[in-house]
Amino acid sequence: MQPEQIIRRPIILTEKSSRLRDQGNKVIFEVRREANKIQIKDAIQTLFKVGVVDVNTLIMRGKDKRMGRGYAKLRNWKKAIVTLKEGDEIQFFDEKAE
């Protein structure tokens, strides 16, 4: 798999991801369910040019959603919590110092 196919999107707008980013130099990504920790680590290092110390993965259970009168289940997805090397940082937005 190509690195672009492994990493789906960063999860940056939650309280937990903001807290982990500020306290522990960790970043959260949604990744493909088939990807393992080694592939995720290599993809992050290739795409963002940062050092990765650790990768923790979780399978998130899909939610039940209302569809008309019935319910449909969303797919399960995989979340990766990536610990970056001390001093490395990933900028998702162009942050201006004010």
From Swiss-Prot:
Write out the GO cellular component annotations: ribonucleoprotein complex; ribosome
- PROSITE patterns under this entry? RIBOSOMAL_L23
Q: Which InterPro entries match?
A: Nucleotide-bd_a/b_plait_sf (IPR012677), Ribosomal_uL23-like (IPR013025), Ribosomal_uL23/eL15/eS24_sf (IPR012678), Ribosomal_uL23_CS (IPR001014)
Q: Which Pfam families does the record match to this protein?
A: Ribosomal_L23
- Which domain of life, per UniProt? Bacteria
An example Gene Ontology biological process = translation
Going by the UniProt record, its keywords in alphabetical order are:
Ribonucleoprotein, Ribosomal protein, RNA-binding, rRNA-binding
Please give one Gene Ontology molecular function term for this protein: rRNA binding
Self-association or partners: how does it assemble? Answer: Part of the 50S ribosomal subunit. Contacts protein L29, and trigger factor when it is bound to the ribosome.
* Family statement drawn from the similarity comment of this UniProt entry: Belongs to the universal ribosomal protein uL23 family.
User: What the protein does?
Assistant: One of the early assembly proteins it binds 23S rRNA. One of the proteins that surrounds the polypeptide exit tunnel on the outside of the ribosome. Forms the main docking site for trigger factor binding to the ribosome.
Q: What is this protein called?
A: Large ribosomal subunit protein uL23
Q: Which organism is it from?
A: Sorangium cellulosum (strain So ce56) (Polyangium cellulosum (strain So ce56))
Q: Which gene encodes it?
A: rplW
